[in-house]
A protein has these predicted regions:
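Short, small-residue-biased leader/transition segments that mark boundaries at the very start
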Residues: 2-9
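Hydrophobic membrane-insertion alpha-helices, especially the h-region
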Residues: 15-32
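N-terminal export signals and maturation junctions of secreted/periplasmic proteins
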Residues: 17, 32-122
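Soluble non-cytosolic domains of exported or imported proteins
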Residues: 71, 115-123, 129, 133-137, ...
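Mobile, glycine-rich extracellular loop/lid and propeptide segments
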Residues: 97, 110-111, 117-154, 158
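Catalytic and binding regions of secreted/periplasmic enzymes and modules that target cell-wall glycans
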Residues: 139-278
Length: 279
């Protein structure tokens, strides 16, 4: 009797385990199907935005166009600065300013940068992009997005000190450690590579759904975005908001009280100078 009872208990235990495993598989499958539905909905919405506004919040710029330290030569960078800044005639024009730069040793993010006493903006942009394998087109775009330095006719000291918006969050003061044109440009290029290698430390990831707000004020809302690549993920780490409908409807203008423009303007500026950021 004891052996028979033991067999019964054993069979009951095996049945219970099998039921638990089956239930876990069903729950996992339901969750996966639900996740796929959310992904499909997000991607469909993103494709609609791309068709309507030429802006895709999940694919702001391709990895191939972002991570390319050979995108432009120093001469090509200089030509763009000269063209964009044609209306500037003051002493502080980006095209005529020079900056003392400090040598930077090679590290896990960038190759070595050799500093010089009087480097042009074009040289700094070219060398920073080359050292850190970040497109010079991207660096030029961010300069214009953050402080309008390419087209400014009378730029202020602050515009140069915070040229790339590096360590200048929307809701706090800028970090003086990164103040200055060279520290901003080289620092931003290096920071981009840091973000890529340490994406797990931040709240935006490629290949999955990410809830992205429209504004620092959470009450303005946001939406799920399926981020398609690393370059787009790091843009959100750098500027953690997406444009709302009012911002997209406004084109290059202003939307409503909940609108933010950083990533919208990145796409618009890049496209105006270099063509589609998605390749």
């Amino acid at each position: 009797r004891s052996s028979a009872a033991s067999d019964v208990y054993k069979r009951q235990g095996e049945t219970l385990i099998a039921s638990i495993v089956a239930l876990a598989l069903i729950v996992g499958l339901v969750r996966f199907v639900g996740w796929r539905v959310q992904v499909d909905e997000a991607v469909a919405s993103q494709e609609q935005l791309q068709t309507q506004y030429d802006f895709n919040p999940g694919n702001i710029i391709s990895d191939g166009l972002f991570f390319n330290g050979n995108a432009l030569s120093e001469q090509q960078v200089n030509a763009i600065i000269e063209k964009q800044g044609a209306a500037c005639s003051g002493e502080k024009c980006l095209k005529s300013m020079t900056f003392s730069t400090e040598s930077q040793p090679a590290n896990e993010y960038c190759e070595a940068y050799e500093g010089e006493p009087n480097e042009s903006a074009a040289a700094i942009i070219y060398k920073s992009g080359k050292a850190c394998d970040i497109s010079q087109k991207v660096l030029l775009t961010v300069l214009q997005k953050e402080q309008h330095l390419l087209t400014a006719t009378d730029p202020s000291d602050f515009q140069f000190k915070s040229a790339m918006g590096l360590s200048c969050p929307d809701d706090a003061n800028c970090d003086p450690e990164y103040a200055g044109f060279f520290k901003q440009v080289y620092g931003a290029a290096k920071r981009y590579q840091y973000y890529v290698q340490h994406e797990d430390r931040y709240g935006y990831h490629a290949g999955t759904l990410n809830y992205i707000q429209y504004n620092p004020d959470a009450s303005c809302g946001g939406s799920n975005v399926y981020i398609e690549n690393k370059a787009t993920a790091l843009l959100y780490i750098y500027t953690p908001y997406q444009p709302n409908a009012a911002a997209l409807d406004a084109g290059v203008g202003e939307g409503d009280a909940c609108s933010t423009y950083g990533n919208r303007n990145f796409a618009i500026i890049y496209n105006s100078m270099f063509g589609s950021p998605r390749g």
